Amino acid sequence: MTRPIQASLDLQALKQNLSIVRQAAPHARVWSVVKANAYGHGIERIWSALGATDGFALLNLEEAITLRERGWKGPILMLEGFFHAQDLEMYDQHRLTTCVHSNWQLKALQNARLKAPLDIYLKVNSGMNRLGFQPDRVLTVWQQLRAMANVGEMTLMSHFAEAEHPDGISGAMARIEQAAEGLECRRSLSNSAATLWHPEAHFDWVRPGIILYGASPSGQWRDIANTGLRPVMTLSSEIIGVQTLKAGERVGYGGRYTARDEQRIGIVAAGYADGYPRHAPTGTPVLVDGVRTMTVGTVSMDMLAVDLTPCPQAGIGTPVELWGKEIKIDDVAAAAGTVGYELMCALALRVPVVTV
């Protein structure tokens, strides 16, 4: 028998989450963001469940080609654009929409030999200060691009740094309005948080990512608990060992947990080599045989320990949900001082994945 840990992906939840995005932004088209191998879920596993989307957005050329090879004929947006001028040959071949955010890309587009014009997303820096042109340069750059034979349809895009806050986009929106002055253009501004909470930023295309997979852009499950969004990934395993501790006995590396009284603990086949966060402290929520309990002690490479006090019936082979439908990935991430995005993306290759 194989080691009992596995990740299961609920494709119906993925479809429902896309439907909820459409309800949240009924007048916009949807770029489903599948970067980082669909946030760790696997593009090849999940793309067809998102077949009702208007387009896919990602980073890697290899992932874009995978979508084309699997039969996706709709738009694909390359969120960081092309990294080298020679990439434009493949962008042309596979009909990819490219972000343009830097001066060197303008020259590369001008000089490229393309069979047909490429659609362009011109990125404005609205305060994130990662990629994009400053607002006072956008009109000039837009006009440069518009004059190029290699450029097809154009859209203005940006990315919000603080859309999870009620007033988090006001400054960015002001900079975007400055950038768009004098332009009649399509816009794509909204990430997951803005899609849910800032309808004034929806415009023509929204770009949901984390909410498609059923986690919160704020890192707090309670913020999306009433939206109908459902977790797509469940990471589960089983108890493979049971120990009964005496008062004062300790658990795991460094002995960081000490039993106050006699206590049963279960040893679960899951550790940081599987993608479970090593820094998850004692008290991180976990579900054992349908009962909510907690981890105890230090997470090891291949194992972790859980308190069996609330579930005395548990023993060898008892199922454990590490995150999923009941134990939200946001709650595990918050306990470990990180975000659900990271845990999804960190799922290890050695963990078997099934779709349901």
From Swiss-Prot:
HAMAP family (alphabetical): Ala_racemase (MF_01201)
InterPro entries: Ala_racemase (IPR000821), Ala_racemase/Decarboxylase_C (IPR009006), Ala_racemase_C (IPR011079), Ala_racemase_N (IPR001608), Ala_racemase_pyridoxalP-BS (IPR020622), PLP-binding_barrel (IPR029066)
Binding sites annotated in the UniProt record for substrate: R130, M301
GO cellular component: cytosol
EC number assigned by the record: 5.1.1.1
Organism field: Escherichia coli O157:H7
Modified residues (N6-(pyridoxal phosphate)lysine): K35
Catalytically driven reaction(s): L-alanine = D-alanine
UniProt-recorded name of the protein: Alanine racemase, catabolic
